[in-house]
Amino acid sequence: SEQFGSQQVSRNYHLRGRILQVPSNYNPQTRQYSGIWDGTFKPAYSNNPAWCLWDMLTHPRYGMGKRLGAADVDKWALYVIGQYCDQSVPDGFGGTEPRITCNAYLTTQRKAWDVLSDFCSAMRCMPVWNGQTLTFVQDRPSDKVWTYNRSNVVMPDDGAPFRYSFSALKDRHNAVEVNWIDPNNGWETATELV
């Protein structure tokens, strides 16, 4: 206090975040999954959005754990999503980075479904209640399920097997402005044109 006199001291902290429950065969530092997962968890720091979501859904104090139990959430779907999020992709500077990370902090109380939807949209997935559990469907590359062609399509009376319609060109977006918290700029909000 003698160094600063009567000046107001400003403090900044660089926090890693919470210790979460992650799969027992997962190494968060290397982002590697070894062997077959037995469905058990271990505590570790992770910024993988799938395990941040698991924490939010099952934690009884600040999450939805008082309403949802671990058996009510499809951990196997989150495991596959977590692996996809951890895949290395080019970072644009000659290196690689994980495909999707989560460095969020929640500061206001909101409806649970809104927070759940926001978490899911960050990793390109949707929450789905299948009648027994809360599961997740992610938009990611996968094998084709069915090929449609003239031999397996019912023809209408006019003989045209397919009718195509598209949105107007003026209604299609080809760029979007994204706001994000930039750790390289003092954690200030930055806008990026993508």
Regions found by a protein language model. Give the residues of each.
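Polar, S/T/G-rich
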Residues: 1-123, 130, 181, 186-188
